[in-house]
Amino acid sequence: MYGDFKQHLQHELESIKEAGLYKTERVICSPQRSAIEVAEKECLNFCANNYLGLSDNPRLIEAAKKAMDERGFGMSSVRFICGCQDIHKALEKAIADYFGTEDTILYAACFDANGGVFEPLFTEQDAIISDSLNHASIIDGVRLCKAVRYRYANANMEELEDCLKRAQAQRFRIIVTDGVFSMDGNAAPLDEICRLAKEYRALVMVDECHSAGVLGATGRGITELYNLRGEVDILTGTLGKAFGGAIGGFTTGRKEIIDMLRQRSRPYLFSNSLPPAVVGAGIEMFKMLEESNEHHDRLVENVAFFREKMIAAGFDIKPTVSAICAVMLYDAKLSQDFAAELQKKGIFVTGFYYPVVPKGQARIRVQVSAGHTREQLEKCVAAFIEVGKELGVLK
């Protein structure tokens, strides 16, 4: 039987390669940081989600070691059997305090948090209204739920209002949006979303994965940016991006919502608890962010500097308030060739093209970090200009 299936898979894989969509893994041989070793060559890393530059932070590494020494390597259990240590509860409280919410529940990843949030809370009597560019984990989570589904074009408030009007027959309604959309780097118009939610009696959920640690005066995410702390019912997020870059997801928000997720959210009920090392480092990370805004402030300065230099050089950059800078090239092959040439010059980035982004919208996604020095940013801009001229993007 496998012979026929193998042949089918080989044919599918070959089709993916012929379409130029086959993904290969580039192997890093160093810690994740602003300068990394790839294929025995040092590169400047501009494609990690390491927004606050904490992935190799010595204080977090020591906290992880300490937690492992004191609490062990792993939990060998789900939370409700025997997988809950006091440090798990302490991390949940730290997250709630950071975002100004009532309670928090931890997951193995934010993919699980988004995948496990809808089915326990909503039924066929309810409606989920989702932005068209929401993350794949939200899309999959919505598919697992029997609620009526509505979708509006990215950040289009007229379409959102139309969906809300059509959903008035449902019992409960929830608007779901990414805080920052990962491919364009644009922020959701959360002020308008919350205004419409109040008018049409809807709940609001925001995925803070690319906005937490980045947006707002102190980096507390899109709710801080719009002065809406405590106004959003559900926030999801990750420890795998700005917050140290390891692994782990969370849902934080209204107490009763979190309590129901503890009872019925399947990824929470049937997945091992986060290991003590990750939890211990997470607690220490939030202590660091409470003590100082230096990492966030440096990130803001770096993003402003990079964007200014790239726009002055003549590149087409998507407007954004986030740390994601989408350098638009439009052609899929050009984006791949551009990224390959940059790597030869010691700049580690990735070209994105269909089906990750719409056809004709290929780009290089540059992710700026607080860990980048001014010299590294200048080197990146210079390499972009050089390759841009070589490939005819710049005159």
What residue spans do the PLM features occupy?
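Conserved PLP-anchoring active-site segment centered on the Schiff-base-forming lysine
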Residues: 117-136
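Conserved PLP-binding catalytic core of the aspartate aminotransferase-like
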Residues: 297-306, 311-346, 356, 360-361, ...
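N-terminal "arm"/small-domain region of PLP-dependent enzymes with the aminotransferase-like
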Residues: 9-11, 15-73, 202
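Active-site C-terminal subdomain of aminotransferase-like
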Residues: 200-203, 210, 215-321, 334
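PLP-dependent enzyme catalytic core of the Aspartate aminotransferase-like
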Residues: 3, 58, 62-66, 70, ...
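Active-site phosphate-binding strand-loop segment of PLP-dependent enzymes
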Residues: 150, 154-206
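Short loop-beta-helix segment that forms the pyridoxal 5′-phosphate
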Residues: 78-84, 92-116
